[in-house]
UniProtKB/Swiss-Prot annotation:
Lineage, highest ranks first: Eukaryota, Metazoa, Chordata, Craniata, Vertebrata
Organism: Homo sapiens
PTM characteristics: Phosphorylation on tyrosine residues induced by IL2 is required for dissociation from HRAS and nuclear translocation of IKZF3 in T-cells. Phosphorylation on tyrosine residues induced by IL4 is required for dissociation from Bcl-X(L) in T-cells.
Induction per the UniProt record: Up-regulated by TGFB1 and 2,3,7,8-tetrachlorodibenzo-p-dioxin (TCDD) in activated AHR T-cells.
Zinc fingers (C2H2-type) by residue: 118-140, 146-168, 174-196, 202-224, 452-474, 480-504
Protein name: Zinc finger protein Aiolos
Described purpose of this protein according to its UniProt entry: Transcription factor that plays an important role in the regulation of lymphocyte differentiation. Plays an essential role in regulation of B-cell differentiation, proliferation and maturation to an effector state. Involved in regulating BCL2 expression and controlling apoptosis in T-cells in an IL2-dependent manner.
Expression (tissue specificity): Expressed most strongly in peripheral blood leukocytes, the spleen, and the thymus.
Family recorded in the similarity comment: Belongs to the Ikaros C2H2-type zinc-finger protein family.
rRNA processing recorded as keyword: no
Keywords from the named record: B-cell activation, Cytoplasm, Disease variant, DNA-binding, Isopeptide bond, Metal-binding, Nucleus, Phosphoprotein, Repeat, Transcription, Transcription regulation, Ubl conjugation, Zinc, Zinc-finger
One example of a Gene Ontology biological process annotation: regulation of lymphocyte differentiation
Length: 509
């Protein structure tokens, strides 16, 4: 009976406390069910605190939860005072949140552009975050909050200060596992590791060359021809390159011309070999394979052997017949030398069996006794002795001049041609040999070429540089004095032999 009465009293007590407790629950949703059970147990008295801990308390909570739901469902909707409390509280809270959100949006939109970055109000620089913007603003304000306690250096960022402190401590935390290299920064170690690896990740897509560093690839693209040609829309670059090459070729030709003129101006320089152009077609039969292939040979010899040998050969031949000299030796120079004392116009003639055919010439009536029939036209077969005196040559020359009347008594520079009249030595460039109607040298194109004459050796030159080099061998005081060693010759034959043999070299030593 006592248990039944106790349960009945408990039920009546719970029914009376439901309206008050329901109002408290509706007013404060933050209270837990344990607090609600404490309020329920408070009506029971302190003697029942120990009894509530157990299965009975769980039953009470379940009954309370079911009854609470029934009360909320059975609550009439017409009573507007009780449900207005939570609704009005939530409205005030939402209004407060809206105010805070509006303030946040205004402050955020004022510094953030439409692209999602934050702009500096001083210079307008866009930053990706607020922290980056604050660090940037320190560059305007001069603020450096991070200071080194050892040397007093200040920095705008903490990372820079930590990196600076490593300089004092000597700490190098990033070490290479392949060598003894150590550094303070991770990116430096990454770049160092590429030196050990064979991998070259940066590759030129135009020529295929690969590099370990991006900077090396950029430097390569600046001079990569394939890349430069691909970047140009047209062939302007190639045309410009061809134009530059053409200019370089012309400049090279000018430099060679200057070098040739400088060599000609050196009066004390040794004579140099001259390689004749193959396009020249003269009335001589010569082999073009004798030309020098190495320029060093031309510089080392530096002597005009052919010009002197030709002078000795044709001056020792029969003086009363026209003569065209061929190179006597393979090392001789490919410059045909024509005697200036024979004013005969030469024309092109085909060679057959090594012997020249009849040459077309002007009507020159020479004495038959001066042209022996037993002697051929070849200069090597000329039987005239080289010991003939100059007077014999002069007499024969005067005999030819008187019969033909084709050569002037004086050269164009006013100097007499005969040896008995004193002659002065001049290094000035003489005009071409006597008038073109007396002696003609025709090239392959049929053009008449200029011929330059040495009055002392009576040698003709087709090239002015070779003529100048030859004239540099003559002395100033005496034309038959060697300008290189001072040796004095009695006549032009001895002088030519001295130059050809190079006797002055022994004297210099």
């Amino acid at each position: 009976m006592e248990d039944i009465q106790t349960n009945a009293e408990l039920k009546s007590t719970q029914e009376q406390s439901v309206p008050a407790e329901s109002a408290a629950v509706l007013n404060d949703y933050s209270l837990t069910k344990s607090h609600e059970m404490e309020n329920v147990d408070s009506g029971e008295g302190p003697a029942n605190e120990d009894e509530d801990i157990g299965d009975d308390s769980m039953k009470v909570k379940d009954e309370y939860s079911e009854r609470d739901e029934n009360v909320l469902k059975s609550e009439p909707m017409g009573n507007a005072e009780e449900p207005e409390i939570p609704y009005s509280y939530s409205r005030e809270y939402n209004e407060y949140e809206n105010i805070k959100l509006e303030r946040h949006v205004v402050s955020f939109d004022s510094s953030r552009p439409t692209s999602g970055k934050m702009n500096c109000d001083v210079c307008g620089l866009s930053c990706i975050s607020f922290n980056v913007l604050m660090v940037h603003k320190r560059s305007h304000t001069g603020e450096r909050p991070f200071q080194c306690n050892q040397c007093g250096a200040s920095f705008t960022q903490k990372g820079n200060l930590l990196r600076h402190i490593k300089l004092h401590t000597g700490e190098k935390p990033f070490k290479c596992h392949l060598c003894n290299y150590a550094c303070q920064r991770r990116d430096a170690l990454t770049g160092h590791l590429r030196t050990h690896s064979v991998e070259k990740p940066y590759k030129c897509e135009f020529c295929g060359r690969s590099y370990k560093q991006r900077s090396s690839l950029e430097e390569h693209k600046e001079r990569c021809r394939t890349f430069l040609q691909s970047t140009d829309p047209g062939d302007t670059a190639s045309a410009e390159a061809r134009h530059i090459k053409a200019e370089m070729g012309s400049e090279r030709a000018l430099v060679l011309d200057r070098l040739a003129s400088n060599v000609a101006k050196r009066k004390s320089s040794m004579p140099q070999k001259f390689i004749g152009e193959k396009r020249h077609c003269f009335d001589v039969n010569y082999n073009s394979s004798y030309m020098y292939e190495k320029e060093s040979e031309l510089i080392q010899t530096r002597m005009m052997d052919q010009a002197i040998n030709n002078a000795i050969s044709y001056l020792g031949a029969e003086a009363l017949r026209p003569l065209v000299q061929t190179p006597p030796a393979p090392t001789s120079e490919m410059v045909p030398v024509i005697s200036s004392m024979y004013p005969i116009a030469l024309t092109r003639a085909e060679m057959s069996n090594g012997a020249p055919q009849e040459l077309e010439k002007k009507s020159i009536h020479l004495p038959e006794k001066s042209v022996p029939s037993e002697r051929g036209l070849s200069p090597n077969n000329s039987g005239h002795d080289s010991t003939d005196t100059d007077s014999n040559h002069e007499e024969r020359q005067n005999h030819i001049y008187q019969q033909n009347h084709m050569v002037l008594s004086r050269a164009r520079n006013g100097m007499p041609l005969l040896k008995e009249v004193p002659r002065s030595y001049e290094l000035l460039k003489p005009p071409p040999i006597c008038p073109r109607d007396s002696v003609k040298v025709i090239n392959k194109e049929g053009e008449v070429m200029d011929v330059y004459r040495c009055d002392h050796c009576r040698v003709l030159f087709l090239d002015y540089v070779m003529f100048t080099i030859h004239m540099g061998c003559h002395g100033f005081r005496d034309p038959f004095e060697c300008n290189m060693c001072g040796y004095r010759s009695h006549d032009r034959y001895e002088f030519s032999s001295h130059i050809a043999r190079g006797e002055h070299r022994a004297l210099l030593k």
